[in-house]
Design a protein with these regions (language model features):
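Loop-helix junctions at membrane interfaces
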Residues: 1-257
Length: 257
């Protein structure tokens, strides 16, 4: 398990160094790290996955020219760690724990004094002839896509994911990657939002309208990247996945007996 964790940590470092987009309101970059989290979640139990993301984040932060510099006081690993942990829970059939984690994180975002449910009021007035342009929030809440992900999380789509990853065909595997990558990346996004609001305060309040407009496209790019990268990797590792999950099941059975 140590060797596997080290290997997947190294794998996580690679996309963590690559730029997806610039952050809004502060210096720094959003990286492509989310395109590989389904692989970590499938192979690693939550604790190992969190450890791998932590180490991978720290390594990437100190690689010259890396996009994965530390922007949130060293807590930058939290979003990716929760992403991997949630996927790991879902793959192992622990949907209740995954749902609690997701709902609790949404709650922490909502109660933060530097976040807003509807963000359109902070959108600046534009010059003529663009003064009519507005952010549609209200009526659309900032967390609209996160709520869609919550609906997917509690739906039948997250049942029997272990079988999809272990025995499903290419199409079924790609669908499973889509499901876990979407839910995981939305949890990672809201976790990043909590860090952003907590550390940058008024800057975050001014920035939410712009984040609202951009984040669906960024998340879509990460989910698409995860499908393209993780599906062939997991398909090629099908026998290894089955062996690891069988060993985990035997270990859990031994502990309960």
């Amino acid at each position: 398990m140590i060797t596997l964790t080290a290997s997947l940590t190294a794998l996580y470092v690679i996309p963590r160094t690559l730029v997806l987009d610039r952050l809004i309101g502060i210096s720094g970059n959003l990286t492509f790290s989310g395109i590989i989290t389904p692989v970590l979640g499938v192979f690693l139990a939550p604790s190992y996955g969190i450890f791998a993301v932590f180490i991978g984040t720290m390594i990437a932060a100190f690689i010259p020219g890396s996009a994965g510099t530390l922007k949130f006081g060293g807590l930058d690993f939290l979003g990716g760690a929760l992403n991997v942990a949630l996927i790991s829970l879902l793959v192992r059939g622990r949907r209740t724990e995954a749902t609690f984690m997701y709902v609790a994180t949404l709650g922490l975002f909502i109660i933060n004094p530097n976040t807003e449910i509807f963000v359109g009021s902070n959108f600046p007035s534009l010059p003529i002839p663009f003064q009519w342009l507005r952010v549609p929030s209200p009526p659309i809440p900032y967390l609209w896509l996160h709520l869609v992900a919550l609906g997917v999380l509690v739906s039948p789509l997250t049942r029997n994911l272990r079988d999809s990853f272990s025995f499903g065909g290419r199409r079924g595997l790609a669908k499973a990657v889509l499901v876990v990558a979407f839910i995981g990346t939305m949890l990672e996004h809201v976790t990043g939002g909590i860090l952003y609001a907590s550390l940058f305060g008024s800057v975050a309040l001014r920035s939410w309208p712009f984040v609202f407009l951009v984040y669906p496209f960024e998340r879509a790019a990460l989910v698409l990247g995860a499908i393209l990268v993780c599906t062939p990797l997991l398909l090629a590792s099908r026998d290894l996945i089955a062996r690891f999950h069988l060993r985990e099941a035997k270990t859990a059975q031994t502990r309960t007996s």
